[in-house]
Design a protein with these regions (language model features):
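Surface-exposed patches in mature extracellular/periplasmic domains of secreted proteins
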Residues: 85-95, 108-111, 193-206, 237
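Non-transmembrane alpha-helical segments in soluble domains
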Residues: 9, 79, 96-99, 153, ...
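Peptidoglycan-targeting cell-wall enzymes and recognition modules
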Residues: 47-77, 93-187
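Low-complexity, Gly/Ser/Thr/Pro-rich intrinsically disordered linker/tail segments
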Residues: 208-219, 223-239
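Short, intrinsically disordered N-terminal pre-domain segments
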Residues: 1-10
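N-terminal export signals and maturation junctions of secreted/periplasmic proteins
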Residues: 3, 14-80
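Acidic helix/loop microenvironments that form the catalytic cleft of cell-wall polysaccharide enzymes
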Residues: 99-102, 196-217
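Short, mixed-charge amphipathic alpha-helical segments
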Residues: 83-88, 164-174, 196-197
Length: 239
């Protein structure tokens, strides 16, 4: 009996004895890094356009046109012209008066003649065949000849606005995209802002544009100029 009890006790003790187990710590897995999101590219800034010096309604009134005939692109070009060549409201009145007459109220940005009579005119820089037609009078004040177009193109390049199409295509391109700006270049090149600051008569300004006194169409120049001075709120300086 005693032997049996000892045997049972040994079994009972074995059940309550914890077996030592060696626990090997497992390394904590590294967290999977989240992918870095690609930076969202910032949109290209819109080019800043100068504000229009006058409204489309005012331009239509001065030029005797319907409002729907005055495009935003035309007004943008006018704004660029005035900003680039520092044409202030006083000079703008003279400028618009001359542009109005020379272009038939902004109807003709290329002279009526095809330009063949300018062929090989060295005084205009027309040294290559076809230059007469390609660079015939362009813009409202009819900038004429390879030489003058090249100078206009070079000036835009100097301003950081290079446009090779001016020389590659010629009058059909420039008259569409720069009718005011190429006219403003002539105005600037001939120091018309400085002249207008002396408060000259409209006829004397027309003589500088047209090349003689009294200028061709002087009554028409006066008509456009009167309306331009009226819109600018500036007294008409006289004929």
């Amino acid at each position: 009996m005693r032997i049996l009890l000892e045997f049972v006790l040994q079994i009972f003790r074995g059940l309550n004895t914890k077996t030592d187990e060696t626990v090997i710590a497992q390394p904590t897995p590294e967290p999977t890094p989240e992918p870095t999101p690609e930076p969202t590219p910032e949109p290209e800034p819109e080019p800043v356009k100068p504000s229009w010096p006058i409204s489309k309604e005012h331009m239509a009134y001065i030029m005797g046109r319907k409002l729907e005939e005055i495009s935003d692109e035309l007004m943008d070009d006018y704004a660029t012209c005035c900003e680039t060549f520092h044409i202030d409201p006083f000079s703008q009145a003279y400028f618009l008066g001359q542009c109005g007459h020379e272009s038939g109220g902004l109807r003709y940005a290329i002279e009526w003649h095809d330009g063949s009579n300018y062929e090989f005119r060295s005084d205009l820089g027309n040294l290559e065949a076809g230059d007469g037609v390609k660079f015939a009078g362009t813009g409202w004040l009819q900038c004429t000849g390879r030489y003058n177009h090249q100078r206009f193109s070079d000036y835009l390049k100097f301003l950081g606005k290079e446009d090779p199409s001016i020389m590659e295509i010629g009058k059909t391109y420039t008259s569409q995209y720069y009718p005011f700006t190429i006219s403003g270049f002539w105005w600037h090149d001939n120091k018309m802002n400085q002249y207008c600051a002396t408060i000259p008569t409209v006829d004397s300004v027309g003589a500088r544009v047209n090349g003689r006194y009294l200028p061709n169409g002087y009554e028409d120049r006066r008509k456009y100029s009167r309306k331009a001075f009226d819109i600018m709120g500036i007294p008409y300086p006289g004929n």
